[in-house]
C-alpha cells in the first residue's frame, strides 16, 4: 500500500476551455456569464462544438491536491472518471503533475467523464456548462 502525505477524495472534472464569440453563444443557446448544468446529450453537443480547446484536470479537491503536491508533498487523488478519452487524459495529467490517481476508471463504458465546458467571450466573460456524470468515490468498491 502506498503512503501519501495528503490524499484527497473528490469530483474529477476536466476543465475544457475555448474562446467563443457572442454569436456562437447565442447560436448554441448558452446564457452568457453564468454556470449552468447540462444533460449528457446537450453536454456532448457543446463539447463537440468547441473549437481549439484547452483541457486541464479540475475539481476543487484535485486542484488543492495538485497545489499541495507542487510544494513537494506526496499526494494521491480518488475520484471517478469514465473509461474514455477524457478519463485517460485526466488520469495521465494528474500523474504527470506528480499526483497518483489511486482508483481505476469506472467500468460502465457508456458513462463519460465529467467536464466543465468554459466558453470565454472576446470581453473575457466566462460562460460555463457543466456536465456531471459520475460522483466521487462514493462506495467501498471504489477504493482498495
Question: What do these predicted ranges mean?
Answer:
Residues 1-78, 88:
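Glycine-rich phosphate/adenosyl-contacting loop at the front of the ribokinase-like
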Residues 9-11, 80-83, 120-122:
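Cofactor-binding loop segments of dinucleotide-utilizing enzymes, especially the Rossmann-like FAD-
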Residues 71, 111-114:
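Short, basic and Ser/Thr-rich N-terminal targeting/leader segments
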Residues 97-110:
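A glycine-rich helix N-cap at a beta->alpha junction
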Residues 115-119:
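Short beta-strand scaffold segments in enzyme catalytic cores
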